[in-house]
């Protein structure tokens, strides 16, 4: 298969693109360059960093925060940096605010929500997806955190479903408890009404997650691009990523291999490293023979700013083969 990302650019139905891999392999550079290519093709594009150690600001050489901001010098491109692991106290959970006037009730319901591991992050992720979808971008690109964090992020819809089932069970237990202490919670009718309001909000959030989950499993709308370098640990993480995404039924058929050294007669160390890399490159080409495997040479300078990204963009579209050592 052609060793470029042209197949991604030529797919008109794509809506969501996730870019991920091991830390320090060039995910942000790759995702930012891809976002630049889409924006230049005329698509209204946003790139969102979900990595707590954000690098988009450095990559675009522009201050980027928690709200979408237009990238200077590139039409149709916006960016934002978010933390999917929001502090529950700052998260707009569909629970307490506006429903309960009694502090004891608020406290108990807060405990009920927090008793489900990962439910706050799942709801935060759902809120993010819902808000991004409402922004009406043609394409959303996620510059994700290192592999383990990303896999957990992509598994949030399953967490949400399990969490909601547990909350429903706790709900009836909590209602039985409330009936024994009506003086604390007010009348049973008032409490039931408040609980129904809360769970109506949660069900709405579940619907959002379900919709997002369906889109993520639609290969015509969503794809994942793996990024790695030609070293053992990175190759191992890439295979783990491919296996997990396959289990989640999320499409992945592109892998970008960064920092590839080409032989240089004037540099013995470069040649030694290139020889070591070739072993892993050959293995990856063989393992992913049904993937678009893009080989990206090690850059002389740090890829930063619009000019640096434009050069990197060109390389993503130029086919290169494994260097002969």
From Swiss-Prot:
SUPFAM superfamilies: P-loop containing nucleoside triphosphate hydrolases. Its EC number is 3.6.-.-. The keyword Oxidoreductase does not apply. The active site is at residue 51. GO terms for biological process: tail-anchored membrane protein insertion into ER membrane. Gene3D superfamilies: P-loop containing nucleotide triphosphate hydrolases. Its main location: cytoplasm. ATP binds at residues 22-29, 231, 258. It is found in: Cytoplasm; Endoplasmic reticulum. The keyword Nucleotide-binding applies. Keywords: ATP-binding, Cytoplasm, Endoplasmic reticulum, Hydrolase, Metal-binding, Nucleotide-binding, Transport, Zinc. Zn(2+) binds at residues 267, 270. GO terms for molecular function: ATP binding; ATP hydrolysis activity; metal ion binding. GO terms for cellular component: GET complex. It is an enzyme of class 3 (hydrolase). ATPase required for the post-translational delivery of tail-anchored (TA) proteins to the endoplasmic reticulum. Recognizes and selectively binds the transmembrane domain of TA proteins in the cytosol. This complex then targets to the endoplasmic reticulum by membrane-bound receptors, where the tail-anchored protein is released for insertion. This process is regulated by ATP binding and hydrolysis. ATP binding drives the homodimer towards the closed dimer state, facilitating recognition of newly synthesized TA membrane proteins. ATP hydrolysis is required for insertion. Homodimer. Belongs to the arsA ATPase family. This is ATPase ASNA1 homolog 2. It comes from Paramecium tetraurelia.
């Amino acid at each position: 298969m052609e060793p470029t990302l042209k197949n991604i650019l030529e797919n008109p139905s794509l809506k969501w693109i996730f870019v991920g891999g091991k830390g320090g392999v060039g995910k942000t550079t790759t995702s930012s360059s891809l976002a630049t290519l889409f924006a230049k093709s005329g698509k209204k594009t946003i790139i969102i960093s979900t990595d707590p150690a954000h690098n988009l600001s450095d990559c675009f050489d522009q201050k980027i925060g928690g709200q979408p901001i237009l990238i200077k010098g590139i039409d149709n491109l916006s960016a934002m940096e978010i933390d999917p692991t929001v502090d529950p106290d700052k998260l707009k959970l569909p629970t307490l605010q506006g429903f309960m006037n009694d502090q004891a009730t608020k406290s108990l319901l807060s405990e009920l929500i927090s008793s489900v591991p990962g439910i706050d992050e799942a709801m935060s992720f759902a809120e993010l997806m819902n808000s991004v979808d409402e922004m009406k971008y043609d394409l959303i690109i996620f510059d994700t955190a290192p592999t383990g964090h990303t896999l957990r992020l992509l598994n949030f819809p399953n967490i949400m479903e399990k969490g909601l089932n547990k909350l429903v069970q706790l709900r009836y237990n909590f209602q039985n408890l409330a009936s024994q202490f009506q003086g604390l919670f007010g009348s049973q009718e008032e409490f039931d009404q408040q609980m129904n309001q809360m769970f109506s909000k949660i069900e709405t959030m579940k619907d959002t997650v379900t919709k997002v989950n369906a889109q993520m499993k639609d290969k015509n709308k969503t794809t994942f691009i793996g990024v790695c370098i030609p070293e053992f640990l990175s190759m191992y993480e890439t295979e783990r990523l491919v296996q997990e995404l396959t289990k989640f039924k999320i499409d992945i058929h592109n892998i970008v291999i960064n920092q590839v050294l080409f032989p240089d007669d004037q540099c013995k160390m470069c040649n030694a490293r290139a020889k070591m890399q070739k072993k892993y490159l050959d293995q990856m080409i063989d393992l992913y023979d049904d993937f678009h495997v893009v080989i990206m040479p090690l850059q002389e300078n740090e890829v930063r700013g619009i000019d640096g990204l434009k050069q990197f963009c060109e390389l993503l579209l130029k086919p290169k083969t494994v260097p002969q050592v």
